[in-house]
Amino acid sequence: MNFLNFSILIFAYLLGSINSAIIVCYIFRLPSPRSVGSGNPGMTNVLRIGGKVPAAITLIFDILKGLVPVVIAKVLTGNEFITACTALYAILGHIFPIFFGFKGGKGVATLIGTLFGFSWILGLIFVITWLCVAIITRYSSLSALVATVIASFSVIFTSDLQVAAPFLIIAIIILVKHKGNIQRLISRQESKIGDKAKAKNDSN
């Protein structure tokens, strides 16, 4: 690995480590997303806490955290594997941010950015899948899980296994981070889109 590739990976991780939800809530003088609602510093929890505008800003910045480094890697290296690894590092930064005690979000919005940066088709697959599941079930977490699995495994059909491997790792990490959501989905206790935030519970 040369210096350029190494620098891009470090940049992706550091950019991913900037938690948009915490910063946006601070700017809008909202409660910390880590202390109310699900306790997860992500877009969905910001939506419950502060409404559409703060949530939209959070979503945009989280997507850009994945999109920007992946596009940079794609343009500067022309190497699909390095580009896929850049996506993984951006996700790792979001989920395990060095600036916030390695306790971050669940990586879904940042994954959207990495997918669009890697291939707009993969990004479109994610968005369409998410919308379909969300419209039918109104569960944001279920929509994210289904879209993550389908979009990540779709990389296998557009690239070789080595390139797909970082995205498969991303899918596994995101599934593990949603363990609490999966348990609540099974017990029918998961919050639906539009539910208001409550005091922090055991969700992450």
UniProtKB/Swiss-Prot annotation:
Keywords recorded for this protein, A-Z: Cell inner membrane, Cell membrane, Lipid biosynthesis, Lipid metabolism, Membrane, Phospholipid biosynthesis, Phospholipid metabolism, Transferase, Transmembrane, Transmembrane helix
GO biological process, one term: phospholipid biosynthetic process
Protein name per its UniProtKB record: Glycerol-3-phosphate acyltransferase
Pathway involvement of the protein, from the record: Lipid metabolism; phospholipid metabolism
GO cellular component term of the entry, any: plasma membrane
Membrane topology: Multi-pass membrane protein
Gene designation per UniProt: plsY
EC number, UniProt record: 2.3.1.275
Disulphide bridges, residue numbers: none
Family per record: Belongs to the PlsY family.
Recorded GO MF terms: acyl-phosphate glycerol-3-phosphate acyltransferase activity
One Pfam family named in its UniProt record: G3P_acyltransf
Quaternary data: Probably interacts with PlsX.
TM region(s), chain numbering: 8-28, 53-73, 81-101, 116-136, 155-175
KW Transport (keyword) present: no
Enzyme class, spelled out: transferase
NCBIfam families tied to this protein: glycerol-3-phosphate 1-O-acyltransferase PlsY
Compartments where found: Cell inner membrane
Entry annotated with the keyword Transcription regulation: no
Reactions this protein catalyses: an acyl phosphate + sn-glycerol 3-phosphate = a 1-acyl-sn-glycero-3-phosphate + phosphate
Function per UniProt: Catalyzes the transfer of an acyl group from acyl-phosphate (acyl-PO(4)) to glycerol-3-phosphate (G3P) to form lysophosphatidic acid (LPA). This enzyme utilizes acyl-phosphate as fatty acyl donor, but not acyl-CoA or acyl-ACP.
